[in-house]
Amino acid sequence: KQKALTEKDPVILFESMIALARKGDPKDKNSMLAALQSVNYDQLTESQQIDLIRAFELVMARMGMPDATAKAAIITYLDPHYPAKGGNELNRELIKVLAYLDAPKKKKKTVPLLSVAKDDNSAGQQSATNSSDLIMRNPQYGMDIAKILSKLPPLQQTFYATALSQVKTGWTPALLDEYFKWYYKAFNYKGGHSFVGFIDSSRKAALKNVPKDR
């Protein structure tokens, strides 16, 4: 265990912390989280950054919320890297952990992304892009397909909105207004009944966290 906590190779460290999270002692949680923070984030590839954040996520999911000091340290470590300039998958992992930790800047950073985030080829977002390829292969149907795709729900924006729906503190009137305007727009997308139901559930969860004076 001590060898795992002092491992210098980031790939081996991530694998070791994931293994310990699944079978280890919860008393080691803070030591494990500190070990993950010892990694130089900027020297990692994007794929390794995703693995690092998933290791944070698994440790906390299995062992519980860290204490206030450890929580603040993780926020200080991860917050400067969000939003990332890389792919959507990295940003999804970051917002999941930062929302769980209730990082104070996450709302101010995320709400503006609701209107500009675009889907990409990252995990979970290939379907719309694969459909877009049809436009190139079948130009005679291009305009019709493009119109259909333009009405599909933007998955990255939906992920951000849902991640914020459980956030209870730190909302300003301006952020709340911008946030709920996204839900109003989202109901116009053609995602089917399941999407509408999902969005409505997310909106209702978010409404529970609106201050009573709003």
Regions found by a protein language model. Give the residues of each.
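Long, ordered, helix-rich scaffold segments
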Residues: 1-214
